[in-house]
Each structure stands twice: as C-alpha cells, then as structure tokens.
Amino acid sequence: MEGRNPRRWWILIVLCLSTLVLVVDSMALTVAVPSMTEDLKATAQDTQWILDSYILVFAGLLLTSGSLGDRFGRRKIMIIGLLLFGAASLAATVCTNPGEVIASRVAMGVGGALIMPSTLSILITVFEEDERGKAMAAWGSVSMLGLVGSPVLGGVLIDHFSWHSIFFINVPVVVLAITAALVLMPESRGPWQKADPLGAVLSAVGMTALIWWIIEIPKHGAFGGTSLVSLAVAVVALGGFVVWENVVAEPMVPLVLFKQRNFSGGSLSLTLVQIGNGGLLLVLTQYLQFVLDYSPVKAGLAFVPMAVAALIGNGAGAGLTAKIGFRPLVLVGMGLMAGSFVLLSTVDADTGFTVPAVALALLGLGAGLAMPAAVGALMGEIPPEKAGVGSALNDTIQQAGTALGIAILGSLLASGYADKMPAGSSEPARQSIVGALAEAGAKDDAGLAHAAREAFTSAMSTTLTVSAAGVLAAALLAAVVLRNRKPGAAEAPEAPKEDIAELAV
C-alpha cells in the first residue's frame, strides 16, 4: 500500500519507550514506598498523597491533553510531556521532604497526561488499519512487560541504591525517547478548530473529583464525609460537561461516538475488565510476600508466567484479528481472564505457587488476546482527525475502571480480612496482615501468624470472585453489543464515520 511511513516500526519503538517510562515509574514506586517513608519520615497521609497525587492529575487532564494533541500536534504535545516528566523525575531525586516529592509527582502527572493519549493517537495515524493490530499488540506487550518487570526493577534498585534511583531511571529513557521522536517521528494533527475552554475545565474538575471520590471510598465509604462532596462535584461537573459538549458548536470531545455500538460497548467492557483487574497486583503481591513469604524481587518474578503468556496472546491475536475479526478474540480472551480469577479464588494459605502460576498464565493469555482487540474495536470507530481525544477517552475509561477496581477490591479485602480474624485480636492485627505478622513475630506467636494468613486468603478468595464476576460481565456485554469487524473491512454502522467527523469538527 502506497503512503505507508517507512519509519513506522521505528516510530513504534519510540511510542513504546514513551509508554514504558510511565508504566515502570508507577509500578516501581510502590516497591520504594517503605524506604521512602522511612527516609523522609513521612506520615501515612504523606505516603497516600505521594501515590495519589499523580493519578489525580493524570486522570483529570487526559481528555484536555488529547484535545491539545489534535489541535497543536501530537508529537509536539508528547515531547512537551516527556520533557516535563523527565524534569520532574530529576527533581524528585533531590527531594528532602514529602512535600517536595508530592510536588514532583504532580508535575509528573501533568507530563504523563500529555504523553499517554499522544502515543496511541500517533500509532493510529502512522499505521494503516491492516497493520494496526500488530502495532497495538506490540505496544500492549511492552506495557505488560513494564507492569510485570517494574516491581523486580524497583526491588533491585532499592537493594543496591536508594529510593531516589526509582525516579532517576526515568531520565535516560526520557532523553532517548525525545531524541528518537525528534529524528524519526512526523508531526500529525487534526483540522484546526476553536478551543473549548469550558469543556476542558469541566472535564478536568469532573474527572479529578471522580477519581478522588473513588480513592476516598475505603476511608469514608461511598457517601460519607468528604466522599459525598467529591461525588457531588463529579456529578455536577461531568453532567455539565456532557450537556455543554452536546450544545457547543465545536466540542472538545465528540460524544456522538458513543452512538457507535463498538465504541460504547467497548468502552463499558474495558471499564468492567479494569474494575476486575484493578486490585490484582495489590492482592497477589501481598499473598506472595506475606503468605508465601517471598522477597519483593521474587514476588515480582512470580508474574513472569503472566508476561510470557501475554506476549503469546498478543502475537497470536494480532494475526487472528485479520482472519476472524475483533469480537471472537474479545470473547475468548475475557472468558480466559474470568476463568483465571475463578482459579485464583480457590487459593488458600497452603496452596503454594503452582495454582497461582497457572492462573496468571491464563490471565496473561486472555489479556493478550482480548485487550488489544477491544481497544482496536473501540479506536476503529474514531475518525483520524480526532485520534488524540479518542485515545484520551480510552485512557480515561481504563484509568477510572482501574481506580474503581482498586477501591472496591481493596475495601473487600480489608473488611473480609478483619471479619475473619479471631475474636480478641488486637486492632493492628485486625487492620492488616502486615500488622498481624509483625505482632506475631514480636510475641513469637505462630498461631496468630497462621490465623492471619488464613484470614487473608479467605478474604482474597471473595475479592477475586468479585473480579471474576466483573470480567465475566464484560465478556457478556461484549457478546451482546460488539459487532464483529476485521481490520480494514467496511462496516455498516448506525452513524457513518463521515457524519461523526462532521459533527465532531
């Protein structure tokens, strides 16, 4: 096919590097929290803000950032994001108190929000649809490797250096990505349109309030205290955003996309999947470290079966999509993912690692088949001139689902654990397995340690059953809503894409 960019596969490497730096930073930081907390003398609230400030800013600015890429140039916005992310990472290496780290994390969140939508939108504009599946599979594989490998990398860096190295490792990767982007990557943008400042403000306020509400659920409940205020702000702002985008002449986000079954169905399916997946690392990492007594590095290596299987699924899915279309891969993949959660829910304190290893391999294979196909079906409905904001919609949907999953599954795990602990257990022992094991070690109480591990695995079983239900619901929704289509094949949609583009711009 004429018109293909001869550098497109090199450009894909740049996009993968840009995505990888975000994934690795977020996951590796979780390993560094204990060391950072001790060194900075941070309170529990400080630690929470170090972790949450990034996601609040990141999720709140995604839609606005995607729109900026469409208007001013996706490469330009991505490079600005990389510069900001790299500078903030470098600043974090010299921080001496929690407030400075939080400020650096806020700046990194802004940079990340500029980077993430641009990577997927550039991929869509550089690759023709017949090659897009392979490109998205490779892009997804790198993200999966970063997700699995970053806890291992974090453990190695903490063991040999300090928590500062978690941030410093971003800098050379950012420099390499910026250099390669300037040399290899062409600029792309949509047709110029009038700015939508009110839409940008409403989306940023609404998404930030929504994510904050989700974060506060485990502490205050869904409708208690400050949670209710956050929810009210989110409902008013996002409701106003929807109304405004439907009446303004040149909307920032073309909400007409949600009239497309593949877009709306794919969006909701991805949300449900991310709710199911959201707490997986949180739950399993604790199981591996506190029940099986793995070191942080060994716990990270335990996810290798998932990474390998995901690579196989991504590779197989890229070829199968062209032959059988998106829908079968989404259904089979999500079915495997649901089955893996069911298998994980059978684990107890004496199971060991064999069953989790098999379940993680199934999960990786299912995710490798389903996730690129679901994103491909969703993104296939977006006109090229709206690739940036369309990518941002996809990112926002998945971020909200992940945050909601962590909140729901984290609450279930905590409450289930407390309920299963023996009557008369101390408050620290009932609050977490970490507290129980610390107390058991201090008192040489093997019975308390065993009870804590039994309580944790029982709560984990309930939590992962809910995860299975969420992913199964996503599969059923996809079965009902998604229309099958092969990449490059014409479809007879309810609203032609020409009309979408016309309404969008």
PLM feature spans:
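C-terminal membrane-cytosol helix-exit motif in multi-pass small-molecule transporters
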Residues: P172-S188, G206-I215, A234-V247, A474-L482
